[in-house]
């Protein structure tokens, strides 16, 4: 199953993206004072000897001679003060590096180093100069084209990848380096264009090799748009995959040097060397996804993203924890994702939702026919709709190996699920709780092909405008209701056709609001009072509200596991919230409180039948509560799943 990694784990409760899909942690520190009146002598910084370098070479600054007369050096802080701006890697270490910029004439760069000792005293700044010389005169451009081998799917939808027929495609936007053939020092760096072409200048009569890096980089020394996206094996402390064809040639050569990256996989699907093209196939799908966003907003600043291909086997997911990254599978004997473009673009959709919109999706396993928590239904449905939009292909395919044959699962986001049960596949039918309804609606909003109930053809820009605008700030949870309400408000001329499209998915459109307040449809597999109302309204100082929690559709992230409550504070005040569960088998009731999409507080004590928190001086406004018993609403389930009542009061 495709799933997201939870972004916040409290008492065994997986709650993704409670604080914008992530969360910071702080620790209690300690302080000490010394007695005896000793005076701390400031440390002494040494930035090393002045250096000379050639454009394109990696330069290492050296602060290792810094010292503290009566203690130790605790930290280093390097800054550039003069010259063409460069990006320092490891600017808080003793030996940071940077790539000498391309210059036409000799240029001096100056760097400053300040060190701090173990008692907090800082040194006077020490400086060092690096003179960067232009490449030798008489140089000519080294040019070429980079391509990678993509393995296509077999024509039959139930068959998987056709390893016998790889296709060379341009490797777009990737870093290319000229390496000195002997020392392997980087002499020049550039990026390929949208056809895979590259060119750079190196010193005349130099033997070089060309290295391709699985990284797209446009850093803060360049105007918007910017990005830094890489594919590597693992997340912390590793470098991107690279490929070199091992060919050395003279920089004076008049012919282009093309690089064709092979799959490293035999026709039968077994490894036949280094699987070289995989990282570049992944990165090319990421490139295509970024172009979709740039077509809507040409000045987008993309946060750094790592794609981890190879280090884990726990499904595919996006997580903002630590370094934002997408995890993909790489097991040829079972499931590998480098050529599954819809899978990659789906996870990139979660990255987009997290960084530019809002992702209230709590994550967890999901599949066709599941009746999901409406936040999960929207997040996962958006992911596959976004993938189809990026690739302009409504047929999503996911390859795997069944032990004897290459296989694939597939579905068409263009095909509206049937509105009656059991549906095909079984249980797959129109619902606000269905990811298939969400992806069908969003695809039909985008595409320009008219079909049954679909006369909408808005393209991607209106979808993007809703995501970065009202969907980001909605006081409701992000669901199909909040999205469609905003889409209609921003596209008044298309309201009638949008209503027709949405109504075909068993969703009420008359007087629709962001909360789905007027919704009357629910799947027959879940009791009506466990699905509706979608939000129960609690009155401050009023009586308790009672809501069923059920596991009829499954546990963790399925419809009826968790219940939503709304309450409003008319003025700033202190408010106490109490929740309890009727579960007689080791109950564990928990709840989370939100305001305007932001996590406010929550109750996550060890298993207990009742939980209570107090919000001190809570500002006026509307609040949402996500309340559940861990027997039904946690991943993994804790206790005995079943049908219980949740009782909640707000005072």
Where is each model-derived feature located?
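C-terminal edge strands of extracellular/lumenal beta-sandwich accessory domains
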Residues: 29-31, 530-533, 563-566, 592-600, ...
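Proline-centered linker/hinge motifs at extracellular inter-domain junctions
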Residues: 40-44, 96
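Acidic, Ser/Thr
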Residues: 62-70, 81, 580-582
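Surface-exposed, flexible coil segments in extracellular/virion-facing regions
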Residues: 77-98
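Short, ordered, surface-exposed loop/turn motifs in non-cytosolic proteins
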Residues: 149-183, 457, 586-589
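Short, acidic Ser/Thr/Gly-rich low-complexity loop/linker segments typical of extracellular
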Residues: 180-197
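Short pre-active-site segment immediately N-terminal to the catalytic Zn-binding motif
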Residues: 328-344
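Non-catalytic extracellular/lumenal accessory regions of secreted precursors
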Residues: 493-574, 582-584, 600-607, 647-651
């Amino acid at each position: 199953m495709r799933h997201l990694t939870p972004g916040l784990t409290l008492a065994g409760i997986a709650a993704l993206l409670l604080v914008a899909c992530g969360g910071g942690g702080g620790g209690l520190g300690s302080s000490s004072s010394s007695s005896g009146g000793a005076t701390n002598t400031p440390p002494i910084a040494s930035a090393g000897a002045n250096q000379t370098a050639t454009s394109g070479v990696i330069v290492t600054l050296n602060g290792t001679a810094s010292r503290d007369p009566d203690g130790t050096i605790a930290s280093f802080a390097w800054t550039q003060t003069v010259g063409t701006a460069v990006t320092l890697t490891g600017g808080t270490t003793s030996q940071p590096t940077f790539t000498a910029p391309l210059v036409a004439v000799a240029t001096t760069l100056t760097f400053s180093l300040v060190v701090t000792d173990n008692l907090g005293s800082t040194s006077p700044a020490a400086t060092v100069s690096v003179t960067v010389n232009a490449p030798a005169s008489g140089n000519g451009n080294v040019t070429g084209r980079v391509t990678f081998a993509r393995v296509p799917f077999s024509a039959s939808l139930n068959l998987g990848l056709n390893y016998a027929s790889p296709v060379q495609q341009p490797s777009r936007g990737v870093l290319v380096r000229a390496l000195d053939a002997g020392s392997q020092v980087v002499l020049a760096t550039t990026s390929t264009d949208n056809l895979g072409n590259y060119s750079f200048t190196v010193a005349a009569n130099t033997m070089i090799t060309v290295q391709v890096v699985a990284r797209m980089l446009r850093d803060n020394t360049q105007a918007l748009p910017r990005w830094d996206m890489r594919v590597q094996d693992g997340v912390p402390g590793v470098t991107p995959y690279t490929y070199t064809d091992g060919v050395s040639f003279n920089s004076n050569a008049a012919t282009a040097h093309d690089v064709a990256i092979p799959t490293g996989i035999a026709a039968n699907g077994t490894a036949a060397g280094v699987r070289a093209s995989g990282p570049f196939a992944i990165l090319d799908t990421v490139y295509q996804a970024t172009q979709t966003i740039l077509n809507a907003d040409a000045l987008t600043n993309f946060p750094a993203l790592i794609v981890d291909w190879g280090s884990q086997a726990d499904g595919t997911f996006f997580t903002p924890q630590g370094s934002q990254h997408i995890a993909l599978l790489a097991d040829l004997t079972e499931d590998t994702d480098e050529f599954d473009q819809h899978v990659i673009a789906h996870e990139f959709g979660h990255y987009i939702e997290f960084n530019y919109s809002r992702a209230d999706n709590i994550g967890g396993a999901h599949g066709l026919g599941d009746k999901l928590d409406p936040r999960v239904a929207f997040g996962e449905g958006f992911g596959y709709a976004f993938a189809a939009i990026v690739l302009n292909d409504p047929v999503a395919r996911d390859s795997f190996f069944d032990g004897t044959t290459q296989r694939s699962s597939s579905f068409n986001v263009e095909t509206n699920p049937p509105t009656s049960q059991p549906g095909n596949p079984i249980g797959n039918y129109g619902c606000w709780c269905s990811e298939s309804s969400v992806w069908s609606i969003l695809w039909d909003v985008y595409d320009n092909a008219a079909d049954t109930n679909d006369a909408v053809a808005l393209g991607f820009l209106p979808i993007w405008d809703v995501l970065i605008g009202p969907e980001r700030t909605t006081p409701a949870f992000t669901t199909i209701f909040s999205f469609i309400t905003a889409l209609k408000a921003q596209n008044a001329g298309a309201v009638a056709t949008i209503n027709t499209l949405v109504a075909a998915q068993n969703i009420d459109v008359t007087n629709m609001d962001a909360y789905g307040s007027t919704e009357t449809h629910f799947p027959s597999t879940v009791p009506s009072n466990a699905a509706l109302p979608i939000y129960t309204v609690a009155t401050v100082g009023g009586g308790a509200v009672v809501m069923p929690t059920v596991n009829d559709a499954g546990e963790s992230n399925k419809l009826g596991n968790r219940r939503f409550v709304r309450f409003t504070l008319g003025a700033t005040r202190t408010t106490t919230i109490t929740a309890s569960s009727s579960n007689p088998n080791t109950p564990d009731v928990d709840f989370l409180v939100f305001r305007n999409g932001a996590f406010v507080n929550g109750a996550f004590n060890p298993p207990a039948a009742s939980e209570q928190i107090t919000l001190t001086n809570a500002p006026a406004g509307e609040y949402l509560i996500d309340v559940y018993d861990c027997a039904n609403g946690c991943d993994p389930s804790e206790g005995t799943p079943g049908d219980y009542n949740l009782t909640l009061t707000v005072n």
